[in-house]
Amino acid sequence: MKQYRKQLQIRWADLDPNGHIRHSVYYDWGAYSRIAFLTENGLSPSRMMELQVGPVIFREECVFKKEIRLEDTLYIDLELLQARRDFSRWTMQHLLYKESGTLAAVLTLNGAWMDTIKRKLTVPPELVFDAYEVMPKSADFEWMD
């Protein structure tokens, strides 16, 4: 897959007192993008529950580059930056763009897959592997060996 992009809906409730997007909304948008991608590739939250696995995040960071306001049209991309070959651990990146093409924010996160019964990190099942295999890779993607 070359690119995964979603248009975002900016709501009044997403604004802070300064009239721009509240910092925590960026993280919500990232989660929305990731779950949408996984669902569209056969790995819905209910399917994860059936498989008894779920993603866990170790670190999540947002770099704010341009102000985003209510009237802006905004898009979010999803890319895989790094991964183990079994996709048990990974680093993803979300790029948030204004309609003009201006990069507004970069959200980066490190995570893994957890067995939701044992509550331990695990190698994910084949369905997870299949979804990650088609996830767009960044230009500088590298395997974590």
Segments (PLM) and residue ranges:
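Hot-dog-fold acyl-thioester-processing enzymes
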Residues: 1-59, 115-145
